[in-house]
Amino acid sequence: YLDCISPLAGGFPAVASAVDVGSGAGFPGIPLAIMLPGMRFTLMDALGKRVDFLRTVIDRLGLNAVALHLRAEDAARQEDLREGFDLAVARAVAPMNVLCEYLLPLVKVGGHMLALKGPGVDEELAQAENALQLLGGKVERVQPLVIPGRDWDHRAAWIAKTAPTPRKY
């Protein structure tokens, strides 16, 4: 799962808190929490069994993280979570336009959204242009993720949160 930590090589921003939306088995949140022990992670998933697993992993590894049984849409309605994170990350969760709706409401203005994607990211970003503008995001860069020994075309799309997300999202 080197693709989860590869964004660290490209100038990872100094942040205090991050949320991994749709964490599933803990990717990318668990590898990032291992590599960045000073950052507070929240791992979020809609399935209770996955969250139980995440809590076990967090406890056994002694990570600076919590796991929440929560959908992103519901998290955005909670005042303590809405625009409460410096960074929101996701890997293999949804197309970019939908992912923006899940992640950007959770990111503080001045923070970032990080989407771990495949070779179609440029097309996805073009299709998400309206969503980005509406939700307060702006594409900062697309970072190729080089995985030693693998011929994969993985990319990290960095979205800067430049304005508050309207309350209806």
Name these PLM-found stretches.
Residues D3-S6, S23, F53:
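Hydrophobic side chains within alpha-helical segments
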Residues Y1-V15:
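Conserved alpha-helix/loop element of class I SAM-dependent methyltransferases that forms part
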Residues L36-T42, A46-Y169:
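S-adenosylmethionine
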Residues A14-G24:
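Conserved class I S-adenosyl-L-methionine
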Residues L8-A9, A33, L104:
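N-terminal cationic-hydrophobic initiation segments that often serve targeting/anchoring roles
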Residues A25-G38:
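Conserved SAM-binding loop of SAM-dependent methyltransferases across substrates and taxa
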